[in-house]
Amino acid sequence: MPSISHPPSALRDFLRSEAAGGVILMAVAVLAMIVANSPLADSYFHLLHVQTGPVLSEKLGPMTPHLWINDALMAVFFLLVGLEIKREFVDGRLVTWQQRRLPFIAALGGMAAPALVFLAVTAQSSGLTQGWAIPAATDIAFAIGVMALLGSRVPTALKLFLTTVAIVDDMGAVVIIALAYTASIKGIALLAAAVILGAMMAMNRAGVRHLAPYLLGFVLLWFAVLVSGVHATIAGVLAAFTVPVVATPGAPDSPDSPLHRLEHALHPWSAFLIVPLFGFANAGISLEGFSLGSLLEPLPLGIAAGLFIGKQLGIFSLIWAAVKLGIAQRPRGSTWLQVYGLSVLCGIGFTMSLFIGMLAFASSPDLIEEAKLGVITGSLLSGVLGYLVLRFAPPAADAAQAETEIDREIEQDGDVEAIEGKLRQ
C-alpha cells in the first residue's frame, strides 16, 4: 500500500506559529493585567465596552469591541479549530483508531477529572455548578509557548502528542459550548442556519473547490447562529466541516485542497492577532477589592484546583493506565517524568477556559471576574510547574535516536504512518 505524503513543513510550521503565538499571548495577558490595575484602567474598560455597532442579537445588545472580539473574531478562531479537527481525522494524526486511542484517552481524563474536582470544591455553594466545564479546557498556544521556552529539552514526539490531545480536547469543548451553554433558541434563525449549512455541504458534494463560496457561507452561517441563540462561535466549527480536504503531497498551498489552504492562511491571523486580542480583552482583571483570601472563594478555588490538580491527575493517570494495560504506548523518546510534565502543562486553560467562563456566568459580572481569577491562577501554577518538570527532567536513553528519526520523517518524507510509528515505542 503506498504511503500518503503530507506537506513536509506543515507540522513544523504549526508548532512554530503556535509557539510564537503562545509567547505573545503570555505577554499580552501580563500587559492586560498591568493596564487593568493602572491609571489607564478606566480607559481600558471603557474602550472594551463602548458601542461600536448595531444590535445584531437581542441577547447581546449593541455591539462593542468586547463583543466583536468574543463573538465575531473568536468565530474565526473556532473556524480554524474545526479545520484542524477535520484535517487530523481525514488527513492527519487521527486517521486510524490506533492513532486516536491514546489522545482520546488522555483528553477524556483531562476533561473529566478537572470537572469532578471543580464540582467537589464547589459542592456546598449554590449557583456555581454551571462552571463545571471551565477547567476542562486546554490552551494549546500557551502550552506550546511554554514548551518553546524549553527548546530541544522537550522531545518532538511530546510536542506533537500535546497538539493532538489539545485538538481532541477542543472537540469536547465545542460540544460542551453547543449543548451546555445554549439557552433560548429562535427557531426561524436556527432553520436558516440549517439551510445555509446544508447549502455548504451541497457545495462540497458538488466538488466546489474555490474558497470564496465557503467563506461567504461562513459569514451568513455566523449571523444566523448568532441570532438563533446558539453561541455564534459554533458556526466556525460547523462551517469548517464543510470545507473540502484533499491530500496534497508536499504542497500545503495547493488549490486542490481548500482546507489546507485556508488553515495555512488562518494560522498566523489566529496566533498573532485574534487570540492575543482575546487575551488582552479578557485577561484584564481589576484586583481592587481582591485579596489572597479571594483565591479561596469556592469559584476561583474550584477552577484553579481543576486546572492544576484535576488536569494532571486525569491525563497522567489514564495515560499510565493505558500503557500498563497494553492499550497504547508511550510516545517514543520520552520518559514518564516528561509525560507527567506534559500532563501538568495541559492545565493551562487560558483562552478556552476564559471563554467558557464568560458563557457559564454571562448574567453575573462578579462571578466572571472570580472565574477569570481562578483561570489565571490555575494556568499560572500549571505553566510554572510544567516548565520546571520538563526543564529538569533527564532525557530518555533513546531520545537522541528517536529525535533524529522523527525529524527525518517530518522534514523529508512527511509520511503519516511512518511518523506515527516513530512516535510510539
Swiss-Prot record:
The chain crosses the membrane at residues 20-40, 65-85, 102-122, 131-151, 160-180, 183-203, 218-238, 272-292, 303-323, 342-362, 373-393. Disulfide bonds: none annotated. Its main location: membrane. Pfam families: Na_H_antiport_1. It is found in: Cell inner membrane. It catalyses: Na(+)(in) + 2 H(+)(out) = Na(+)(out) + 2 H(+)(in). Keywords: Antiport, Cell inner membrane, Cell membrane, Ion transport, Membrane, Sodium, Sodium transport, Transmembrane, Transmembrane helix, Transport. It is a multi-pass membrane protein. One of its GO terms (cellular component) is plasma membrane. HAMAP family: NhaA (MF_01844). Belongs to the NhaA Na(+)/H(+) (TC 2.A.33) antiporter family. Na(+)/H(+) antiporter that extrudes sodium in exchange for external protons. This is Na(+)/H(+) antiporter NhaA 1. The lineage of its organism: Bacteria, Pseudomonadati, Pseudomonadota, Alphaproteobacteria, Sphingomonadales. The gene is nhaA1.
